[in-house]
């Protein structure tokens, strides 16, 4: 094991190199700080509207370096630092600086943005604050002179003495809906009605029962509810879910109200016991398509009541 004196002799060259490097760095930092101080005092760098947080951080770092330099000077002179008040000040300053680090991280974006704006004179193109609502955009882009000219132009146009001047900003004119000729033929209409009848026939209870009878799949046992009621409940649940998720009330058309009334009436009446769905659209026959064609309401014309002219009764 080497003696303590030998260890100290081995560390002397490394210590000398560190002191030389430290001296060079201190010289550079001193020159840089003096240049900044001169610019601030001459008014080149205006620090009147600076951030108090950064000013406090700079003051704490300066105090920390002063106490640290004082302790290094005491140790270099061979004096003991035990009980030195500078140690307690260093611990206190280090604690405050550590507590300020989360705040520094939160303010980093705002500080960098302000520094960049002060250097370049404008914000970045991708800065999110460029897309925020700007109340200045609500102000009319026309100057008072242009507005006065437009008002005078309208007055002249009404009187007929002069033509209306063309303004740079044109008024918005909504597009007009042009009438379109209805080119639907009778054959296309019949084909559409037949397709609708096939769709209704495939969803009928008769086809569903035949499918369950001849299918090899296991029979699915449901509650004692009709197929049309199950379909109605499914549509009603979908409607409720849409209203609750979108926070909006859906209005029912007259056609939907009539269908709902018809479905509810089928469950409360016994007339539908012997009623079977029309599946002639699947077999090629001519089924009833009267229910698929929208009915045209006819106005009821009754006998007109004769209106007698009321007058004053003569007194005898």
From Swiss-Prot:
GO cellular component, as recorded? axon; chromosome, centromeric region; cytoplasm; dendrite; filopodium; nucleolus; small-subunit processome
Keywords (alphabetical) are: Cell projection, Centromere, Chromosome, Cytoplasm, Nucleus, Repressor, Translation regulation
Its predominant location is nucleus
- Domain of life, per UniProt, equals Eukaryota
Which GO terms are recorded in the biological process aspect for this UniProt protein?
Answer: regulation of translation; ribosomal small subunit biogenesis
Q: Does the keyword Cell cycle apply?
A: no
InterPro entries of this UniProt entry?
A: Sas10/Utp3/C1D (IPR007146)
In which compartments does the protein localize? Nucleus; Nucleus, Nucleolus; Chromosome, Centromere; Cytoplasm
Family affiliation: Belongs to the SAS10 family.
Q: What is this protein called?
A: Neuroguidin
Q: Which organism is it from?
A: Xenopus tropicalis (Western clawed frog)
Q: What is the lineage of its organism?
A: Eukaryota, Metazoa, Chordata, Craniata, Vertebrata
């Amino acid at each position: 094991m080497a003696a303590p004196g030998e260890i100290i002799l081995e560390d002397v060259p490394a210590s000398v190199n560190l002191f030389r490097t430290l001296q060079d760095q201190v010289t550079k930092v001193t020159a840089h700080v003096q240049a900044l101080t001169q610019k601030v005092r001459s008014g080149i760098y205006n620090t009147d509207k600076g951030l108090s947080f950064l000013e406090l951080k700079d003051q704490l770092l300066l105090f920390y370096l002063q106490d640290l330099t004082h302790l290094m000077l005491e140790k270099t002179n061979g004096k003991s630092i035990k009980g030195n008040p500078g140690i307690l000040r260093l611990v206190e300053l280090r604690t405050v600086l550590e507590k300020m680090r989360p705040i520094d991280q939160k303010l980093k974006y705002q500080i960098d943005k302000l520094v960049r704006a002060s250097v370049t004179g404008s914000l970045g193109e991708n800065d999110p604050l460029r897309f925020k609502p700007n109340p200045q955009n609500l102000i009319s882009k026309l100057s008072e002179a242009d507005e006065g000219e437009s008002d005078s132009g309208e007055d002249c146009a009404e009187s007929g003495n002069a033509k209306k001047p063309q303004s740079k900003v044109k008024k918005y004119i909504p597009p007009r809906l042009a009438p379109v000729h209805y080119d639907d033929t009778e054959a296309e209409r019949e084909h559409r009605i037949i397709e609708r009848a096939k769709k209704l026939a495939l969803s009928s209870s008769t086809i569903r029962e035949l499918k369950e009878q001849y299918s090899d799949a296991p029979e699915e046992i449901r509650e004692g509810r009709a197929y049309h009621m199950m379909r109605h409940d499914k549509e009603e649940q979908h409607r409720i879910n849409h209203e609750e998720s979108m926070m909006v009330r859906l209005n029912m058309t007259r056609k939907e109200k009539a269908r709902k009334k018809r479905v509810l009436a089928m469950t409360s009446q016994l007339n539908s016991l012997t009623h079977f769905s029309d599946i002639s659209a699947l077999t090629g026959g001519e089924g009833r398509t009267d229910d698929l064609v929208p009915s045209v309401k006819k106005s009821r014309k009754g006998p007109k009541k004769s209106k007698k002219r009321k007058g004053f009764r003569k007194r005898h």
